């Protein structure tokens, strides 16, 4: 899974308008550089959250061929954490970060639209 995460992070940075991500979600290139974020740091701090998000996403979100304009990734993150106790009761700490949710959704093949501005 680590290699898949690195590949997704690299793909985001190579987009027409480069996109950078950390545990908080999408960030500007300046913020990414200022915080000295990198793929290894993301994996070291977010792997547990990505795995939890990866497990619950297919149980909560059906894939469609339409984009979701009603929910932000932040709202979806909260929806996941609120539903962990009912859906995956063995998970002790239901917290996942926004960045982990985004990466896990990409790993599942959910598509995203290039933001006009971050």
Regions found by a protein language model. Name each.
Residues 40-87:
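Positively charged, polyanion-binding regions of nucleic-acid-associated proteins
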